[in-house]
């Protein structure tokens, strides 16, 4: 019987996407995330009661490798790559461990982490293998979280989805920068956007986004391509959304201002609290006005508007 290997990495929460992507690049056949924030809180806005779970600063990223892969080499390579990034991001005290699994354990083990999750008033994310019957008005996003880039339940993604629900009214052109799983593009389509153009520098992300989009019917209005932020893009948009690290966000703000239409919006997420002032100042220097600021735990997200009428914006 073929066996699989489980490699667990304990890392600070802000390192989730970075570590997940590195593990996939190093040959992982799937990743799963254990995060106490997914369960913390007594009652959410939909009246769902969550169990009492102590909130932790760290999460566990679990990657799965076939027994043909030498995970000691993977571990060494991962350690070396992460060591190069310690000045860029505080990943905490990294802990890495491995376990052997039988084939039948691998087939179902990682799926136990994922259940349908109501994210906003309208949007529910459902694992691709789950039969789920939507209620009236509920919009379903099918994702395959085994492909990488998480499940769409990370705080930065949740706030991005709330922001899209806030600004989209139907008929808009949306640019999704750093699309990852494609979840924000799929949500934009479900919320009525006319055309969505999704970009990612990572070829794996481009493939994963396309595969997730194909899990959802009626997504022909989403166009996925490789791209470095908004460089070379000449498409005017009503909404630009980017859920990526703050140090990268500041490099797309000028292009975003160039491309977003008057009265259009720039949504940014993935901003740890220590970087919020930097991002806000960069956006305001470019000419944007802050309309909405959201905080969940240590994460910030925001909606900026390109407008001459500042009566409805923060500080206007």
Swiss-Prot record:
A Pfam family assignment: PrmA
Signal peptide range: none
EC number(s) reported in the record: 2.1.1.-
Subcellular location: Cytoplasm
One GO BP annotation of this record: methylation
Keyword Iron-sulfur recorded: no
InterPro entries hit by this protein: Ribosomal_L11_MeTrfase_PrmA, Ribosomal_PrmA_MeTrfase, SAM-dependent_MTases_sf
Name of the protein in its database record: Ribosomal protein L11 methyltransferase
Species this protein is from: Streptococcus pneumoniae (strain ATCC 700669 / Spain 23F-1)
């Amino acid at each position: 019987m073929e066996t699989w290997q489980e490699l667990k990495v304990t890392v600070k929460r802000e390192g989730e996407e970075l570590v997940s992507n590195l593990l996939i690049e190093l040959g992982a056949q799937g990743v799963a995330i254990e995060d106490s924030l997914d369960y913390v809180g007594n009652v959410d806005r939909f009246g769902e009661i969550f169990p009492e779970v102590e909130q932790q600063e760290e999460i566990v990223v679990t990657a799965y490798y076939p027994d043909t892969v030498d995970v000691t080499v993977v571990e060494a390579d991962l350690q070396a790559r992460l060591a190069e990034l310690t000045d860029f991001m505080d990943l905490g005290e990294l802990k890495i461990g491995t376990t052997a699994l039988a084939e039948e354990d691998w087939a179902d083990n990682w799926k136990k982490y994922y259940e349908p999750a109501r994210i906003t008033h309208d949007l529910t994310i459902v694992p691709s293998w789950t039969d789920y019957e939507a209620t009236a008005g509920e919009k379903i996003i099918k994702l395959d979280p085994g492909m990488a880039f998480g499940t769409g339940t990370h705080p930065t993604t949740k706030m991005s989805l709330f922001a899209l629900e806030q600004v989209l009214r139907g008929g808009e052109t949306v640019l999704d920068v750093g699309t990852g799983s494609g979840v924000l593009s799929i949500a934009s389509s479900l919320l009525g956007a006319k055309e969505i153009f999704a970009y990612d520098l990572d070829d794996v992300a481009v493939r994963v986004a396309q595969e997730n989009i194909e899990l959802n019917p009626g997504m022909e209005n989403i166009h996925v391509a490789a791209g470095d932020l908004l460089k070379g893009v000449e498409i005017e948009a009503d909404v630009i959304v980017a859920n990526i690290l703050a140090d990268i966000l500041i490099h797309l703000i000028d292009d975003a201002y160039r491309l977003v239409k008057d009265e259009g919006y720039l949504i940014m997420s993935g901003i740890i609290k220590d970087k919020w002032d930097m991002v806000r100042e960069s956006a305001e220097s470019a000419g944007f006005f802050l309309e909405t600021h959201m905080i969940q735990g240590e994460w910030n997200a925001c909606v900026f508007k390109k407008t001459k009428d500042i009566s409805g914006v923060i500080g206007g």
